[in-house]
Amino acid sequence: MRLVESFLSIQGEGKYAGRLAFFFRFAGCNLRCAGFGGERISPKTGAILRGCDTIRAVFTNHFEHEEILNLSQLLNKIPNLSGSSCFAPACSAPGFCAAESFFESDTLNSAAAQTPFCQKDNGENSLNLTSENSLNFAAQNSLNLDPQSAAASQSAKLYQKPIIVITGGEPMLHHKEALFYEFVCELLARGHAVHFETNGTILVDFEKFPAYKSCVFAVSPKLSNSAEPRERRLNFAALRSLRQNAKDSFYKFVISPEFDAQPEISEILAACESEVYCMPRGADRRELESGAQFCVDFCLKNGYNYSDRLHIRIWGEKDGV
C-alpha cells in the first residue's frame, strides 16, 4: 500500500465543502480517464501521461510514493491542532494517540475479554473493530477518565476535529487490506469522521468490513467523456450497495458546456438515486470561473445542487492542498 501525499486543507467540493479536512491520497486506480485532458510528463520515462487531475495517483509506476508498512506511519501524519499530540483526550505521546493508555487499560482488557467484536491487535496499540458496536466503545468508556483527562476532554470541545478524507486514485481498491481497514477503524475509534472519495466501481463488502458503514462516500461515477468503456466505469450494484450501507453518500459530477451530461446522470439516478452535486470543470481558476455560470444554470434546470471547487479557486493548480 503506497501513499502519494497527505495534507491539511479544507474539503473543496461536494456536500461537505468548506470543512476542515486532512487528506490521505493513496496510489492506485482501476480507471485512466484519458478523456479528461489532464497531462503530466513521467519523471522516470519522459512519457506523456494523460488522465484526470490526480495522474500521480493513477500512473503509480512513474512516480515515487511512500510505502506504508505500519499503522503509525499514517497516524503520525495527522497534525497537532489542539495543543496535544492528537485529537483524543489526554494525549501523552508524540504522534501516537494518547488514548493508548486507555487502550492498554484494565477497562479495555476486561471488556475485550467479554466482547468478541473488540479485539486487541498484537502489532499496534489499536483496536481491531469487527462490529459497528465497537466504534462506540471508546466513547462510552471515556466517561470514566481521570480528572486530568476529563479536563483535556472538555478543552477538546473548543475545536473541530478535521474530517479525514481518504482519496486516490481509487482508495476502495484497498478496502479489504488488513492495514487499510485497521487504519479506518482506528480513525473512527478516535472520533474522526471518515470520508471516502471513490468512482463507485468497487463493490464494498460491508458485512465482512462493517466499519465502512460508519463512513461517508463521495461518489463520482465516470461519464462517457472520461473515455472509459461503459462496462468499466459503471457498476450499479456497487452504487446501490454504497447507498444502502454507508452512513451517507452522494454523487459528484463535473459539468462543462462541451458535453451534455444530463442523459447519463439520469441513467445513473434511475439505477440508484442519491443527492447530486455538480461542479464546473476547471483545472485552474480561469477555467473554473468561465464554467461556473453554465454549471449553475445546469443545476437550476435539472434540480441539482451546485458545488464550487474551493481548492482550485484558492490555490489554483498547486498540489498538496
Model-derived regions, located:
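Conserved Radical SAM active-site core
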Residues: M1, G35-G123, N128-T130, N136-K213
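Short, solvent-exposed loop/turn segments at secondary-structure boundaries
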Residues: Y16, F63-H65, P229-E231
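Conserved AdoMet/S-adenosylmethionine-binding subsite of the radical SAM
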Residues: Y159-P162, M172-V321
